[in-house]
Amino acid sequence: MPITANTLYRDSFNFFKNQLLSTLTLAVLAALVTTLLGHLFIPDSEQMKLLTEAEFTFATSGKAGIQELVSQMTPEQQSMIMRAGIGTIFSSMIGSVLLVGGVLTLVAAVSAGNRISSLQAIGLSASQLPKLFLLLLICTLLIQFGLMLMLVPGIILSIALALSPVIMTAERRGVFASMKISWKLAFANIRLLVPAILLWLTARLLLVFIIDRLTFIHSEMAGIILGVFNNLISAILLIYLYRLYMLIASPQQKSI
């Protein structure tokens, strides 16, 4: 019997509905971790004042370009910029790793007939989190690089690497082995992956647009709300990808 996207969508949403509390807990936890870690790297009020003064001085000088801006900064200001940038990436990656590891472990356990909580899911995935962090970091850098070149390469890489976290979690594969298998399976089942990835990207863009219009919400609260809903959207995609992989992965494919 052929696999249809409608069947997978229905199955994924039913799972999401039945495990809503656990999934929501994981989404909130990941968003809070990202926010709290982000605050550790955000410059304090005095440092922000120095950065603002540097930006104002640069803007009034009539120059343009990020390289010129950085070159005009003091070493202390450059260090703050670098720290904030690295901190933002690191905190976002940690939140993503907790979400991906927790959701995929939850789906695997429930599919096997075991009842576990969201915290138990994170605990069970702990041994995989370092490898998962490396995998997500590499995939994110590749996809962002593709998006910077042109939009299409980034989308293609998003589709090609979409199954790699599922493969790593389900099959205990290494980073590059998971990416290799994902690449082959993704293009062999592209009709089932493209709509899901495009819906995911569209939903995230719409969410950013909506949250950005809610000006009455404090910026920090808006950031947390955006993070939670982004995580819920990603959780639905992860459930879909796990279900899809379980259907398309034959013993021959698993031995690749």
From Swiss-Prot:
Keywords: Cell inner membrane, Cell membrane, Membrane, Transmembrane, Transmembrane helix
Matches recorded under InterPro entries: UPF0259
A Pfam family annotated for this UniProt entry: UPF0259
Transmembrane regions: 23-43, 89-109, 132-152, 192-212, 221-241
Localisation per UniProt entry: Cell inner membrane
Gene Ontology CC, one term: plasma membrane
Protein family (similarity comment): Belongs to the UPF0259 family.
Protein's name according to its UniProt entry: UPF0259 membrane protein plu2479
Species whose genome carries this gene: Photorhabdus laumondii subsp. laumondii (strain DSM 15139 / CIP 105565 / TT01)
Taxonomic path: Bacteria, Pseudomonadati, Pseudomonadota, Gammaproteobacteria, Enterobacterales
